[in-house]
Regions:
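Catalytic acidic motif of RecA-like/P-loop NTPases
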Residues: 11, 24, 42, 256, ...
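Phosphate-binding glycine-rich loops of NTP-binding sites
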Residues: 20-61, 262-268, 316
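Conserved ABC ATPase signature
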Residues: 31, 218, 222, 226-270, ...
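Electropositive, glycine-dotted interaction segments
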Residues: 86-219, 225-228
């Protein structure tokens, strides 16, 4: 699970640190940096797992505009299997040639070195923290991405597992056809556009979870029966409903945006809001009704433990009033400068947090 992240020289995040608990709701007006935090964690995850390189994960447009510093720095702290891992990364930019590369990359486990890379060379340490041979690495990629599980290096591989179990999603239930599944995929992408591919992967490896999801969806919609894949040329994800004793099926693209969003959200929570997982959702309550939002936040609260984690961004009054009093992290940004963590707004009139926000009780990103 995420403990904290430190960032410098990335968009509006300058000498910035944010700590996380089990449930976290990021709050603040548009432009204060909420989505920047979520998307940065997604970028770090993709980079560490070898899915992107420095040019894709940390493009020039991510440099802080009002500074002329050629280095970005990041520090990510995770807890996994009772060990605390710290990941440190520095990305160096050549402004003239419009290129960037890894300047330094370090992994610590309980304060001990597991991986230390600098200037294209890396040292890997075994589970007893003894130094191994020096290896050459690609300056444009994470050296950790090429580390595979070995008996002597289980801790470093556990770090990769911990990163892989950070699930980041900003679900968008429109603008693409995502009903066809041509291949299994283990990880959901940022917009959930590959939901059918991940569904295919999970239904074959963890059918018990799928049965649990069906039961949850039946409690929300008593006419829901099941979901299933069917079709020869690419399997189509179908939803089956009961209408007066007659079962009818609809492809994922045939149901409404709200129904698709509801399915994606409960799919995410049931499949990934589990032990040692961190689930990060950017504005998940778009497209769904007020009662459905209330059911969703209660469902998340009921499944929360000290072993799983959820980070949310939401402007929805129900979500704000449910989570903000105990789990809110308030962000502000003045004059389009640096993002900072602010104290919660105060009210002497007994207003809820959502009412305070709607009446301008927080500083805008001026």
């Amino acid at each position: 699970m995420l403990n904290y992240i430190k960032v410098d020289n990335y968009c509006s995040l300058v000498n910035f640190k944010i700590d996380f608990s089990s449930i976290n709701l990021l709050l603040g007006h548009n432009g204060t940096g909420k989505s920047t935090i979520i998307s940065l964690i997604a970028a770090l995850r993709s980079f560490i797992l070898g899915k992107t390189d420095t040019s894709t994960a940390f493009g020039f447009q991510t440099l802080t505009r009002w500074q002329s510093v050629p280095v970005q720095s990041f520090e990510l702290s995770l807890t996994y299997k009772n060990s605390v891992y710290i990941y440190q990364l520095e990305v160096e930019f050549d402004v003239k040639d419009k290129k960037n590369r890894v300047k330094k990359e370090i992994v610590l486990c309980d304060g001990n070195l597991l991986f230390n890379a600098e200037n294209g060379k890396a040292l890997i340490y075994n589970d007893s923290y003894q130094q191994g041979p020096e290896v050459l690495i690609n300056w444009l990629s994470s050296g950790i991405s090429s580390v595979y599980e070995q008996s002597e290096y289980k801790k470093l591989f556990d770090f990769k597992k911990a990163v892989d179990q950070i699930i980041v999603c900003h679900p968008l239930p429109f603008d693409y056809d995502f009903s066809l599944s041509f291949m299994e995929q283990q990880s959901l992408d940022y917009s959930a556009s590959n939901i059918s591919n991940v569904y295919m992967y999970i239904v074959q490896r963890n059918p018990e979870k799928m049965m649990e999801l069906w039961q949850v969806l039946k409690e929300i919609n008593p006419y829901f029966v099941r979901t299933y894949l069917n079709g020869d040329n690419g399997k189509v994800l179908y939803f089956e409903y009961d209408h007066n004793g007659v079962k009818n099926s609809y492809a994922l693209t045939e149901i409404s945006d709200g129904e698709r969003m509801l399915f994606i959200l409960y799919f995410l929570v049931v499949m990934y809001f589990d032990d040692d997982y961190s689930l990060l959702l950017d504005e998940p309550d778009n497209f769904i009704s007020l009662p459905e939002v209330g059911q969703l936040v209660q469902f998340i609260q009921d499944r929360a433990t000290n072993k799983n984690q959820c980070v949310l961004i939401s402007h929805h009054p129900s979500v704000i009033d449910f989570f903000a009093p105990s789990n809110g992290i308030w962000l502000e940004r003045r004059s389009y400068g640096a993002t900072t963590i602010a104290n919660p707004p105060k009210s002497d009139c007994g207003l809820t947090y959502s009412e305070i926000i709607s009446q301008g009780g927080m500083n805008e990103a001026e």
